[in-house]
A protein has these predicted regions:
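Short, non-ligating residues that shape and space the ligands of small metal-coordination modules
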Residues: 214-218, 240-241
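Short metal-binding segments enriched for Cys and/or His
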Residues: 236-246
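Coiled-coil termination/hinge junctions
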Residues: 146-210
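Amphipathic alpha-helical coiled-coil segments
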Residues: 55-67, 107-128, 174-175
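Short, charged, amphipathic alpha-helical segments
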Residues: 40-47, 71, 97-105, 125, ...
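Short coil/loop "hinge" linkers that interrupt or connect long alpha-helical coiled-coils or helical hairpins
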Residues: 69-106, 190-215, 226, 230-235
Length: 246
């Protein structure tokens, strides 16, 4: 037996469909906010900067370790120079004095060479620290920009959520007025085909903009106003009004 519903109840489906369409649009808007793409780009940039910072931090640590080894080598040489100087001052043996002076000359040259290398490494360390500082500053800039974009996104999402809550409440009000069997059919068609109700306006189905054939219009004209009919082109419940062209 065909489903029956008063024309007024059927017209409620158009309001329900409009609200469902708006809810879908709000969900799409929430997923399509421009901030989402900006945040993804910033995250990718931040990942690149973090990798660069990690590499530069490792390079700085390597140079710092090299400098520490050089400083240790200089300390060892300084200690040997001090020891040999003390031995030289206390020695009366010509042979020992000659040997100590020769060793001191070699040690002083070694110390000078190490200190020269040390200066070069210190310059490299300064460069490495400056490079790391730039990477760190760049990351801080991205973090700051990201926080600002997140705030914009959250504000937009809150606005959408508020509008969605209001729309959902309106939908609930309309749905409560629709007979249960008619609402069940509407829900079934909407879940299956994407649209639950379509307005027939001057022979055109609003669900897809398709003009119905004359034989289809003749069939519709032959149905009672309280007959619930399915649109032959969109499979939505076809709602008839004074503007349907019947």
């Amino acid at each position: 037996m065909a489903l029956k519903a008063s024309p007024d109840d059927q017209k409620l489906l158009l309001d329900l469909q409009a609200l469902d369409t708006k809810l879908a649009q709000l969900d799409h808007r929430a997923k399509s906010l421009p901030q989402h793409a900006v945040l993804s780009a910033l995250d990718a940039e931040l990942m690149t900067l973090r990798a660069a910072a990690l590499e530069r931090r490792g390079a700085r640590e390597d140079v710092a370790l090299e400098l520490k080894r050089l400083e240790s080598d200089v300390e060892v040489v300084e200690a040997r120079i001090k020891r040999d100087t003390e031995r030289l001052e206390g020695s009366s043996s010509v042979k020992d004095v000659a040997a100590l002076e020769q060793e001191l000359t070699a040690l002083r040259k070694r110390r000078d060479d190490l200190e020269e290398i040390e200066l070069t490494v210190m310059e490299r360390l300064e460069e490495a620290e400056a490079s790391l500082a730039v990477a760190t500053e760049n990351m801080a800039g991205i973090d700051e920009r990201r926080a600002a974009v997140e705030a914009e996104r959250d504000a937009s999402l809150a606005e959408v959520a508020s509008e969605r809550t209001h729309t959902a409440a309106n939908r609930q009000t309309i749905a409560s007025k629709v007979p249960a069997d008619l609402l069940a059919l509407y829900t079934k068609q909407r879940d299956r085909y994407g649209i639950g109700a379509s307005l027939l306006q001057y022979g055109v189905s609003s669900a897809n903009g398709v003009k119905l054939l004359e034989n289809e219009m003749q069939t519709i004209r032959a149905t009672a106003p309280d007959d619930v009919i399915i649109c032959p082109s969109s499979d939505a419940i076809l709602v008839r009004t004074n503007e349907s062209g019947l």
